[in-house]
Amino acid sequence: MSIPPFSQASLEWHEGQPYSAHFGDVYFSRESGLEETRHVFLRHNQLAERWQTMQQDAFTIVETGFGTGLNFLCAWQMWEHTAPSHVRLHFVSIEKFPLSHADLARALALWPELRQYSTALLAQYHQIVPGWQRLVFCQGRVQLTLLVGDVLALLPQLSSHADAWFLDGFAPSRNPEMWQEALFDNMAAFSHKHTTFATFTSAGIVKRGLQAAGFEVHKVAGHGRKRDMLCGRFTLNERPAMRAGRAVVIGGGIAGTASSHMLAERGWQVNLVEQEPALAQHASGNPVGVLYPKLARKDVPLGRLSLAGYLHSLRLLQQLGLDATAHARCGMLQLAFDQRELERCQTIAAQGFPPELLHWVDQEQAGNIAGIALQYGALYFPEAGWVRPRAYCEALAGHANITRTLATRVTGLSQHGNAWQVWTGEQLLDEADIVVIANAAQAASFVQSRHLPLEQVRGQISRLHHVDGAPVLHALLCTDGYISPLIDGAYCLGATFVPGDTTTSVRDEEHAQNLDMLKHMAPSLYDTLMPQAPTGRAAVRCTSVDYLPLVGPVLDAALLEARPPRYTADPASSLPWLPGLYVNTGHGSKGLTTAPIAAEMLACAIHHEPAPVDSELLAVLDPNRFVLRKLGLKRLVRGLACHPLRR
């Protein structure tokens, strides 16, 4: 995966205060940065008053310039003391030159009264790379979405309205590239009639730009030595509203439990329906699953999703608190087993990723990390590892707002007014405001989603017991398959890939394929474990014909084909949506990496909240993309990015 040019902030320290060498300016007031933040951004967006009386279930702040995170921490502190306990704060901040972890820690140490908040931020402020990253605090009540890159490139990729804007960053005279007409126009595009803004600057170019974009602008007293500042509100557009209600999620694997969890976190009462007597019985039922990103040399959607999902899953697992018996960050070595793979790995390693995310290691270093002799160098992911899928699913489904209906197969869905009725045979099982279909290939069994081109792929894993006295593998090894480190006295390796095969009996020939992979990846380990008869498990995974998941709202495909829409200025309004019906499926063998972030995408879209990824990626995952392309309507492939009617 190719990433944009990326560099961390170049800081100087003047009398203990951070100073930007690039912009030639300070990050905050030398006299009282805290009071300046509270005066400019909190007070002049009327946040305390708005939060004390807010009716919606979430509030979104968008900031230009994260800097030291001071504005975020002050907003979080005020939120905790003024907002109702059941609502959420989304703080979206765009930063071109993020501080290193060490510099951020040093800067935030200047504000001891914020220590509890800065400590929580620093605990998650790792592996910060270009693009979208979501950090979650207070059991989901506070969410920070960091957008690393150029503000004018990233701002159009937002997927929700802002309730308040923090126009920070450096002064227009120091940072003219940011303070452009495009900034103000994009602000207008993502504002509603109650959206406010505040900024420390009173420059004429800013005042005129905001007014031209539709903002009512006031010049008021600044803070300290700053005589004037600007604040105001947007004058157009109504804010869409969405309240949590009742949801049914179909499917008890990683996609279904993650979807249930993200909705439950937002106050939904969720009925999680699974046809088996327990969760995680099919593709999510393997004893061990691996968690790592599969990156490409170039910026392709699958690589972008893989990286975003990997980082999201690492943070989610940390929040869930799975113990060492269920999850371990043992590190992963992606072996450069031939010349093509060597070039791919080294190209990725040279793209500027932080070393704590990935870096190249030579053959000797790889062997030292693994604990066994290896024949190849590798791309090393220090935080990658393994997880027990069943424990993961149980933790996700353990939310107090989730009830489980097990050993029950959903056979049909029907609309009844503004609700969805969920049927098992002739019996009405439930009635809900929204339904999320997350039952793998069985999603295509419903009339409403039978147009989804899902494919089934058999995969078999093999387990080999450790031999006493032999070297122990400590890290995850990957090529086209994987070998786990030693877990419960055995190694897990796999998985085979057999498209179109839906049988689940264990086969000797597929054990042989896995053993051949082991022999090629780690011959020294193979020699110590053979001869030995492996045990194993086979399951059927679900993928799409283009190997990208299907995530988003569902169209009425029959009506679409009967009456294709004409071109309109608003493509979302021209499509026959099935309001309240969503799908999260087709994750294939990468479900542990991609399904949780897909669930977060769905929940955010339902609530008009900022997405954890850019709008281009949301569009790529549109579950209706195949039928739209078939009808020559490729321009309407938008999915979650186009804000269809939610109910």
Curated annotation (Swiss-Prot):
InterPro entries: FAD-dep_OxRdtase (IPR006076), FAD/NAD-bd_sf (IPR036188), MnmC-like_methylTransf (IPR008471), SAM-dependent_MTases_sf (IPR029063), tRNA_MAMT_biosynth_bifunc_MnmC (IPR023032), tRNA_MNMC2 (IPR047785), tRNA_S-uridine_synth_MnmC_C (IPR017610). It is found in: Cytoplasm. GO terms for cellular component: cytoplasm. It comes from Methylobacillus flagellatus (strain ATCC 51484 / DSM 6875 / VKM B-1610 / KT). The keyword tRNA processing applies. GO terms for biological process: methylation; tRNA wobble uridine modification. The keyword Nucleotide-binding does not apply. This is tRNA 5-methylaminomethyl-2-thiouridine biosynthesis bifunctional protein MnmC. Keywords: Cytoplasm, FAD, Flavoprotein, Methyltransferase, Multifunctional enzyme, Oxidoreductase, S-adenosyl-L-methionine, Transferase, tRNA processing. In the N-terminal section; belongs to the methyltransferase superfamily. tRNA (mnm(5)s(2)U34)-methyltransferase family. In the C-terminal section; belongs to the DAO family. It holds the Pfam family DAO. Catalyzes the last two steps in the biosynthesis of 5-methylaminomethyl-2-thiouridine (mnm(5)s(2)U) at the wobble position (U34) in tRNA. Catalyzes the FAD-dependent demodification of cmnm(5)s(2)U34 to nm(5)s(2)U34, followed by the transfer of a methyl group from S-adenosyl-L-methionine to nm(5)s(2)U34, to form mnm(5)s(2)U34. Residues 1-235 are annotated as: tRNA (mnm(5)s(2)U34)-methyltransferase. The gene is mnmC. Its cofactor is FAD. GO terms for molecular function: flavin adenine dinucleotide binding; oxidoreductase activity, acting on the CH-NH group of donors; tRNA (5-methylaminomethyl-2-thiouridylate)(34)-methyltransferase activity. It catalyses: 5-aminomethyl-2-thiouridine(34) in tRNA + S-adenosyl-L-methionine = 5-methylaminomethyl-2-thiouridine(34) in tRNA + S-adenosyl-L-homocysteine + H(+). Residues 250-647 are annotated as: FAD-dependent cmnm(5)s(2)U34 oxidoreductase. Its EC number is 2.1.1.61, 1.5.-.-.
